[in-house]
Each structure stands twice: as C-alpha cells, then as structure tokens.
Amino acid sequence: MAKRKQGIFGRIWFVAWRFLLLFVIVLFLFRFVPLPTTSFMLQSQYPVKHTWISIDKLPTYMPLAVVASEDQRFPDHFGVDFTAISKALDQYDDGDGLRGASTITQQTAKNLFLWSGRSFIRKGLEAGLAIGLETLWGKKRILEVYLNIAEFGKGIYGVEAASQHYFGRSASKLTMNQAARLAVLLPSPRTRNPNDLTFYLRERVDWVERQMQQLGPDYLKPIIE
C-alpha cells in the first residue's frame, strides 16, 4: 500500500514539474512575441476587438496614465504591493469586504491566466503568477502586455482597439486627456464610456491628469527605455 501511494505521488510530481517547466518556457517565449489571446478574451461573452501595438509606438503619457490611475508604485514593487494588501486585509477585517489592492502585474496575470471575481484562492494564484512575470518578463514587457490585454469596454481589449473604437484614431496619436479618459475605465470597463463621463469620472480624469503631472514625464523612463 505504501509503495503504491509513493508511486501515485511520484507520477503526480513527475507530471506537475513537467507542466511547470512547459509553462515557464511558454511564458518566457511570450516575453518576445505578441500574445494571441488571454483567459479573459476566451471567456468573453462579447465579440472580441483586439489589436496589438508596441509600447514603443505609444505616447509616453498612455502608460503613465494607467500607472497614475492604477498602480503608482509599479516601478518599485516586485509584482505584489504588500502595503496595499495589508490595508485591504485591514478593511476586510473591519467588515468592508475583500477589496482589490492588485498591482498592474497582478492584473496582467489575472487577465492572462485566471478568472474574474474575488477570493483568497484566486488572489494567491494571482500573486504567485505576478512574481513569475516580474522574474521572466520585467517591467517594460509587463506594462506593454497590460496595455494590450486590459479590457476597456464590452469585448474591447487593449489601448489600440479602445482608441480606435472610442476616438477613431490609433493609440499612437492619443492626447494626454484621451489617455486619462481611457485609464479611468479600467476598474469597471463595461459600464463606463470615455465619451460619456459622469461627474465623478470627470473628476477622476482631472485627478489622473494631476497625478501624471506630479509624477512627471520621465517617471517611467527607467523601465521603458
């Protein structure tokens, strides 16, 4: 009986480490080539609009806008912002529910491999994958992929598809204000429209633009260039 259990666990371990090795190899390859799809795109109930664009073709304020809005500590953390997680857990203990606290790297990992919803299991997987992305890809690639796979509307993925859909132009020609208007869609992209902003979202756009100015045009230069 003991030998049979050892044999079963041995086979499970053999399959698991081979799967992990294959996953790492595939992840490493996607450091250099555009990703054809993501978990969220495959799960989408809407027709998918998605066009890849190199981060080098984007105006510098497009990545700066999403960093200012979503994760200002992006250049400094290693995929997981433990300070933000600690605050979220304190709020959870106070009965406020499980909140986000996800970094851009974690959001990239979630969109690529996981599912929507909030649970400790998904958060744990998300954090582990985020550290893997930081290790294998680096900041510039993570930000490039995020800008290309984040959802900006019903079935609209990536800043190029979003810019074409909402503004009728390539993301390479976005203005600073348009970049900020796209950035504020990210928490709830299916219920927001950059051309029909509520008072709250207009205030949010103004806040993002102020944050962009405070961070400065060179804030992301060390990781993008």
Swiss-Prot record:
Gene3D superfamilies: Biosynthetic peptidoglycan transglycosylase-like. It catalyses: [GlcNAc-(1->4)-Mur2Ac(oyl-L-Ala-gamma-D-Glu-L-Lys-D-Ala-D-Ala)](n)-di-trans,octa-cis-undecaprenyl diphosphate + beta-D-GlcNAc-(1->4)-Mur2Ac(oyl-L-Ala-gamma-D-Glu-L-Lys-D-Ala-D-Ala)-di-trans,octa-cis-undecaprenyl diphosphate = [GlcNAc-(1->4)-Mur2Ac(oyl-L-Ala-gamma-D-Glu-L-Lys-D-Ala-D-Ala)](n+1)-di-trans,octa-cis-undecaprenyl diphosphate + di-trans,octa-cis-undecaprenyl diphosphate + H(+). Keywords: Cell inner membrane, Cell membrane, Cell shape, Cell wall biogenesis/degradation, Glycosyltransferase, Membrane, Peptidoglycan synthesis, Transferase, Transmembrane, Transmembrane helix. One of its GO terms (cellular component) is peptidoglycan-based cell wall. Disulfide bonds: none annotated. The chain crosses the membrane at residues 12-32. It is a single-pass membrane protein. GO terms for biological process: cell wall organization; peptidoglycan biosynthetic process; regulation of cell shape. It comes from the Bacteria. Its EC number is 2.4.99.28. It is found in: Cell inner membrane. GO terms for molecular function: pentosyltransferase activity; peptidoglycan glycosyltransferase activity. The keyword Cell wall biogenesis/degradation applies. Pfam families: Transgly. Pathway: Cell wall biogenesis; peptidoglycan biosynthesis. Peptidoglycan polymerase that catalyzes glycan chain elongation from lipid-linked precursors. Belongs to the glycosyltransferase 51 family. This is Biosynthetic peptidoglycan transglycosylase. The lineage of its organism: Bacteria, Pseudomonadati, Pseudomonadota, Gammaproteobacteria, Oceanospirillales. The gene is mtgA.
